[in-house]
Amino acid sequence: MSRGLWLLGLLYLLPAHSQTAVPKLRLPDAVQPVRYVVDLKLLPGEDPFEGRIDIEVDVRRPTSVIWIHANALEIQSVHFQSPSSTTAMNADAHENDLVGLRSPAPLPPGRGSIHISYRGQVSRILTDGLFQQRYNGDWYLFSKFEPVTARRAFPCFDEPSFKTPWRITLHVPEKLRAFSNAPMMSEEPESGGLKAVKFAESKPLPSYLVALAVGPFDVVDAGKAGRNGVPLRIIVPRGRAAEAASAAAQSPKIVEALERYFAVPFPYEKLDQVAVPLTTAWGAMENAGMIAYGSSLLLTPPQQDTEVRERDRVSVMAHEISHQWFGDLVTTAWWNDIWLNEAFASWLSSKMLMELRPDWKVNLDAAVSRNSAMNSDKLVSARTIRQPIEVPGDIANAFDGITYVKGSAVIRMFENYLGAGVFQRGVQLFLARHAWKNADANDFLAALNTAAGKDVGSLFSSFLNQGGTPLLHIDVSCGAKSAPVVHLRQERYLPLGSEGSTQSIWKIPVCLTRSAGTAAERQCVTVTRQSQDFVLEGSKECPSWVMSNQNGAGYYRTAYDGPWLAKLMRNGMPQLNTSEQLGILNDTSALFSGGLLNAADALGTSVRFAGDPDRHIVQATIGMIAAAAELTPPEYRPNLGRLIQSAYGARARSLGWSPKSGESGDDRLLRPALLPLVAISGADTALRDEGTRLATAWLDDRQAVDPDLVATALSIAAWNGDKVFFNRLVAELRRSKLQRERIQIVSGLKSFGDPALARSALELLFARDLEPRELTSLLTPSRKETRPVVWDFVKSHFDELNARLPGARGIPFAAQLPLTAAGFCTEQQRRDVESFFSGRMEKLKGGMRNLASTVENIRLCEKRTAALQPGIISFLKPY
């Protein structure tokens, strides 16, 4: 074509003679890519870029149109080359980034190549697609293509099922370094101060796993690992090599642990891990052979590193490196099965850390995550794990807590049910069957069935394909001469005020633990009906307690009928492991929220276990108290404060603001949760004043506060802070050169209670000398009192926020703004939210689901307050 065509996602009418319908969602399979050859000229610091792409294709059926994806690319010319001829093609742009490449006559079946020359723009705002950032005076260029933004870098078949080799050449300034998925083959000088960097042909990859990075990087050698001695490197912005020491030390251990589990060598020729100065809406990306991380996750100055930061870093690294097998070597066929990537990586991360660092007790963190997933899953508007993708916006919505956290919890349940060895054989079989190819849920379940020697897939599917959490009612009847019988009844757990139906049936693998003399015994059954009984094996004596969720691994809530909750609390709790105890406490909180347990029993349980030695148990009780605090009227806040002081005050003061030599990791992790609870809600003047003193000292001396407590101290100081302190925080925000410090300062800025200061903090989002992408958490206030301030700001600046702040995964930023109102609790507020967003969210991909969940949360809060507040008041009155 002689003129450029800007592909901006606008809808153009097809010529009247066209016989080919525009795809509604997925590309047709008449033409499939076989290989990509990409040639890009990338100049960090300059927005325009030039590209050529040759796509070798297999034309399976005669067609006059080849459908591909492109977004914001200027197509300059398109030709189709067959073994016998070369044909010029026209490019027609359609909605949803679809482009029809049209030939004058139908293309015959067989091999051919599409040759496209084009231009595009490198974004300075987004952190997906091709984007660039200036850091310490240098420009760096990166890519992040999952799920649907490879099409902003090159025209391509941008769906995960199209998995092919890629051969990439980059033309970049001669003084810069360039990286991609495959090893570099050569560098050749070119005119104009450029060089051509050629990379080896990659293994078969979908477009979303292709990766590029260009800039004045430093490279840290992390050694070699695994059976094949894979070279490992950490790629960092210039001058930050020392901050990669921990990541470099941990990488070989993680790779080798994963190789042992999978019984498959690391699949790629190298593993680079690249630090990106700033990311929004993502923390890391599992590009094959070249993982990208937000620098705050991967890098830390050695003198500021702590166990808390190391836990976060190693956990994310294990997640991303496990993707090299689960997601990259075997790739989901379509986005409805993204759980096969993300849920497995989340589960494997915990499993690997249990092997590498058993002292971290990440199995308990997994139990906490399971409860978090159930709290999200209580909504009728919640997605299913394997949610059908019906419109493009559903793709981005699939990357949520249901996919990651519920998915990993369900995997953990079936591993516990089948046994770790059987489950591992199923995983290994799945990888062996589908290496370098695509797979879906049915493929994984077939491998699991083979390994188990029985039908597991139908059980697993009942959790994949329907939303919600099972609620299992349990009772036991004991006869004088017969074995005890357990009575189970299942329904969907719903919170108070929900308009959903409880009539859901799962196929639940239930592993029950019961008393057996002074020990405990396990028995597993499969519950497939609404009501089901089974006999306790091996004993005719009535148990002194039963517990329905061995290891806390089951993805279900439990309600103990009759005397069995009291018996469990009195007789069973001392014999249970911490995961099981944690599950009972979390179920207690959920039953209270569901109106199935009174305030005295629920809050009394939290007080009883507030002094537990394990931080996870303590944090679970804090969660119950915090939920009650949301419903406590102002006149009873002093009572709540005295309860908090009596339950947690002594421990908070004992921990204090200064870590002690030789203290446990649990103490370090508990301190940031306990200190603000007691200092603020517990009205502990001494703790609050010390936190304020330390925060003020930190503004002058960054060594004055333990690194793990900086955000806590700044938030406490801001709680009753004045304009003078606010202005000091803003001044330091502008002065600081370290992203981690700026994030800590923002945690303070969102904690002011003065509405005028809260408003001033929000207005920083439009300050031209600040990075707005670092300030988005200001839209999720720490305080109930300032939620209306945020809401008014969102209503007044909706369009400006959408224009100023980057979206992610093809979803505009404004699609997330309904979530800023999720903490509201009255009918009037709900109506205001619905009225404001009506007509707005329908136009934004992904927006309607966020609005639905927010409206449902507000409605539930209305009902919960009316039903539970009297019981909470009654419980608090004696304090």
Task: List PLM regions with ranges.
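A surface-exposed beta-strand-loop module
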Residues: 72-135, 191-193, 531-541
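Long, ordered, helix-rich scaffold segments
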Residues: 370-371, 401, 487, 500, ...
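Glycine/proline-rich low-complexity spacer/linker segments in large multi-domain proteins
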Residues: 25-28, 108, 117-167, 215-222, ...
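N-terminal, polar/Ser/Thr-rich
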Residues: 17-50, 136-139, 160, 457
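Hydrophobic alpha-helical and helix-loop surface patches within well-folded domains
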Residues: 75, 199, 227-499, 627, ...
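Beta-strand-rich binding/interaction modules
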Residues: 75-81, 456-457, 467-549
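Surface-exposed beta-strand/loop patches in extracellular or lumenal glycoproteins
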Residues: 54-72, 167-173, 489-511
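Hydrophobic helix-coil surface modules that form long, contiguous segments used
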Residues: 51, 143-148, 155-318, 347-350, ...
